[in-house]
Amino acid sequence: MGNISRHLEQGNESVANYSDILRYASGLCMVEESVQRMSIDFKGAHFPKNVILYAVFFYVRYPVSYRDLQEILAERGIEVDHVTLNRWVVRYSPQIATQAQMRKRHTAGSWRVDETYLKVRGKWVYLYRAVDRDGQTLDFMLSERQNVGAARRFFKKAITSSGVPHKIVIDKSGANLAGAQAVNNILKITGADKLIEILQVKYLNNILEQNHRFIKRITKHMLGFKAFHSAAATIAGIEVAHMIRKNQFANDNCSPFKVFAELTA
């Protein structure tokens, strides 16, 4: 850690962007971890917790619009307007996604990293995603830009949640290559025994391309996102639903909704 501090004082930009990578990977961040494991607070909600969670889960798991969901809930005797449904998804999905990252099963150290595209306010934004060699979700990040800075932020986020990989497979993107190389620069500076093997082989990322399809299938029916923060929150919920579908949690013998609900406990 002394090496990192020294380079930070010298203003090394790549180190400044990644100075906490090894802190998280080596388990030196127990305070943050304990905070993240706290249960989600539903105080002040005007509906029962299970009703809120059912609505959020249904929206992020199935291809429906908010008005569709409003009608579905009304048929079950629950009167709630589409604006409230949107508020629930935006408020609770990111919190549930944080819990999901803390509780997901161990993932493999061989990563596949790529990005796909979504529209927010009529403009394209970029969804960075990483899965392991078995297709298990590692992490994700919505970005308004597709550049080296975004790639660096994503690698930092993914390593924070899933540890340092031994291999990263990317496409021919120069930005993603620079992001992965920045991680190796940090490992060199901090005296790591091994660096990450970086491969640019498109066909090895086919498993991630197939993974993208689930996300696109759900978002296709959402009639577009009006704001970046609501898009990011909704994507977080969709990713959790996809992780449940892929049995990434220890209680995967339970129903998908129960697994989702238990992430809030």
Predicted region positions:
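Short, small-residue-enriched loops and turns at beta-alpha junctions
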Residues: 144
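Charged, often Cys/His-bearing segments associated with DNA-binding zinc-finger transcription factors
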Residues: 1-119, 148, 152-168, 172-265
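Short conserved beta-strand segments at catalytic cores or DNA/RNA-binding microdomains
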Residues: 121-137, 147, 155-158
